[in-house]
Structures are given as structure tokens and as C-alpha cells.
Design a protein with these regions (language model features):
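Cofactor-centric catalytic regions
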Residues: 1-28, 40-177
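Generic long, charged, amphipathic alpha-helical segments
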Residues: 33-39
Length: 177
């Protein structure tokens, strides 16, 4: 099994998929190769807004935070499931190498994939108040991205891209070269 991350950031070669996989893998105790990242926007299946896409360093200023937040929520659910399965406290669970285990006791563990299967195949046996499934959606909306004003103007960027080109030229006065 693997973890899938879907983001509405559309990279143009900046390595968004690599960064997203590394963040999620780190939070969930997996290898980045165990994380599949979908970095496309299909308006038939995904909500689109003015804030969707890739511009003005939006990925590092907004999307990375949403990815980390969703991964932390999934990790909390996994720890709750592991605690229930292993009969320990959720705060005593660590996620390492694809397993949820008792901190410092690798032998007392359960594969994360087994916990994910439990949420799907046996939802009646989940801890109280836990919804079936193991997925999260995180939306981060910075305060300065306010609603449209009376003239329907809207701020669409948290940061602004810029480019600075610098050229250093050395000329030998004697030869003009």
C-alpha cells in the first residue's frame, strides 16, 4: 500500500511532488517512495478557485502548510488506532518504518497498512467517535486573502514573485575586452 497526497498546486519543474512526499513520509514514519503525489488540477473532480495553481511562491507559503497539517491529522488517527490495537496510550505511539509502535519497543508494533485496512474493512470496530476511512483535507487560507470587496476585487496572492538579473562584466581598458 501507499499514501496518496493530492494538491491543487501545479508545479512547473520545482519539485513539489518530492517535497510533498518528504513531508508526509516524515510525519507518518514512511519512506518517501511510499507516498504518491498527485499535482494536477482537474476542475471536473476538484474544486478550483482563484487561489488554486502555482504562482508567487504559493507552494512554500501555503501548500506546504496544508500538506503538513493534513499529514499530522492522519498521524493522529493512526496513533489512536494503534493505541486501541496495542492497548497503550496514543501519546506512547511512534510511527517508524511503516509501523506504529510503542515508543522504544519495536517488538510491540502494528503495520500502518494494517491500521488503514481496519478503517475500511471493519469500521464498526473503530474507537468511539472515529469516522471510517483514513484521509484528511486541509485548507489554509491566509488572513490577507480576504473576500472580494465592493468592486469585486480580490487579493489572490500571499507573496509576490520577482526576478532580479545581475550581470557582472569586467573590461580590460587597454584592450577593450
Amino acid at each position: 500500500g501507499s499514501v496518496t497526497v493530492k494538491t491543487v498546486s501545479t508545479p512547473a519543474g520545482q519539485g513539489h511532488a518530492t517535497v510533498a512526499a518528504q513531508i508526509v513520509a516524515d510525519v507518518l514514519g514512511l519512506h518517501p517512495n511510499d507516498v504518491d503525489v498527485v499535482t494536477e488540477v482537474d476542475t471536473v473532480t476538484s474544486a478550483w478557485s482563484l487561489a488554486s495553481g502555482n504562482y508567487a511562491n504559493r507552494f512554500s507559503s501555503v501548500v506546504v502548510g496544508a500538506i503538513a497539517e493534513a499529514a499530522e491529522r492522519v498521524a493522529s488517527k493512526i496513533k489512536l488506532l494503534a493505541a486501541d490495537t496495542l492497548e497503550i496510550a496514543p501519546e506512547d505511539v511512534e510511527l517508524v518504518g511503516g509501523n506504529a509502535r510503542l515508543v522504544g519497543v519495536p517488538e510491540k508494533s502494528v503495520p500502518i497498512r494494517r491500521l488503514a485496512q481496519r478503517t475500511h474493512w471493519h469500521p464498526a470496530g473503530l474507537p468511539e467517535d472515529m469516522a471510517p476511512g483514513l484521509f484528511e483535507t486541509s485548507i489554509i487560507s491566509p488572513r490577507l486573502l480576504d473576500s472580494p470587496d465592493e468592486q469585486d476585487r480580490v487579493a489572490s496572492a500571499v507573496t509576490f514573485g520577482y526576478v532580479c538579473d545581475l550581470v557582472a562584466v569586467e573590461v580590460e581598458r587597454a584592450t577593450g575586452r
